[in-house]
C-alpha cells in the first residue's frame, strides 16, 4: 500500500513538472458568523424579456430586472450586446449596477472620420421619450450606491443636420456614492445632472452633449469627475454645431465643496467650464489637467468661493466668434481663482478679462497668442479686483497687461516678454511691477 501511495505521489509531481496538470486555488468569500458567504448576483435583462433588436420597447423588461436586483439587496443587471429601445424611463435602485459590455468608454467617429458607423455594436440604449421637453423626467435615475456602467446611450430621433430638439437629462444622480463609469453619451441634449449627489464618481465618460454636459450643485461632500471627453463625434453639421457653439456649456459648477476634477476635455462650446452662484452657494475645488478647445470662452467665472478654484496644468484654446477669450472673470466674482502651469493659445482677442472684487492669479503660465486683429489689446486685461502674474511667458510681441482704474492691487513679477515690456497701468491702487525680462 505504501508503495502505491509513493508511486501515486511521484506521478502527480511528474505531471505538475511537465505542465500536464493544472491546479487552481479558489478562495471563497469571507464568511460572517451566522450568515452565508456574500455573493455577487447578476440579472440578465434578456431573462426578463428584453429583445435587444432596436424595435421592441424593452423598458419594462429592464425595470423588472432592476427591481429584482433591488429587492434582493443589490446586484448587477447585465445587458448583453444589442440595441435596446427604451421608450420610457429607468430607475436604478440602491446598491444595483446597470452594466453593459464596455469595459472602457467607446468613442464613435465624427471629427476626423465621418464615414464610420454610428452605434450598432456593444451595448446600445436607444432613447426616444421626452422629445421637446427639457424639464421632463430623466432617462436614467441613480440613487445611493447605484451605478451605470459600460453602455452607449443614443437618441436616434435627434437630427444631426438641424438645431437640436430638447430632451430631459440623460442621467440624474441623487443621493450618496452613485457612479457613472465607462459610458458613452453620444448625443444627449443634457448629459449628467449631479445635484444633491454627494461623493459621486463620474469617470471615463465620452460623448457630445449638445446643450450641457455635466451640472454639479448642492454637493457638500467631495464629488469626483475624471477622464471625461466631450467631442463632436456625432455631428459637426453647420446648423447643429453653430447652435452648440452659441448655446452649449460643457461643465457647470454651482455649490460644491472640495470638488476634484481630473483629466477632462471639451471641444466646441459657448463655454467650456462655468462657475456660477446658485441659491445653494458657490464652488471651490481642485481642477487638474483640464482642457477646452474651440470654445468661445474656455473658462467663465461668475462667482467662486474665497478659498478658491485651483486650476493646474490646464490647456485652453479659443478662436471663434466675435470676442474669443480663454478666461472671463465676471464683475460679480468675489472669490479666488488660481491658474498654475497652464497654457493658452489660438488666434484669440485676449487671454483673460478680469472684473469683480476677487483675486485672480497666474503662475508659471504660457501665453502664446492674442490680439489677433492687431487692435492693441493686452493679453491680460484687469478691470478691477486684485491680480498676481508671476513667472509667466508672453510669447507674442504685443501688449502684455493692462490695469484699469478700479484695480485695487496688482503684482507683476518675474515674467518674460517677447519684445519690449508693455504694461499699461491706470490703476489708482497698489501696484508692484519688477524683475521682468524683455527681449
Predicted regions and their residues:
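Bacterial N-terminal signal peptides that target proteins for export
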Residues: 1-8
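Bacterial signal peptide processing site
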Residues: 21-22
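Surface-exposed or flexible loop/turn and strand-edge residues in extracellular/cell-surface modules
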Residues: 40, 74, 81, 87, ...
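Acidic Gly/Asp/Thr-rich repetitive segments characteristic of extracellular carbohydrate-active
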Residues: 45-80
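Extracellular beta-strand-rich solenoid/capping regions of secreted or surface-exposed proteins
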Residues: 63-71, 84-99, 105-149, 154-177, ...
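Feature marks extracellular polysaccharide-active and adherence modules
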Residues: 80, 87, 93, 99-101, ...
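Extracellular beta-strand/beta-solenoid scaffold signature
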Residues: 120-140, 161-172, 186-193, 208-220, ...
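Leucine-rich solenoid repeat scaffolds
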Residues: 401-439
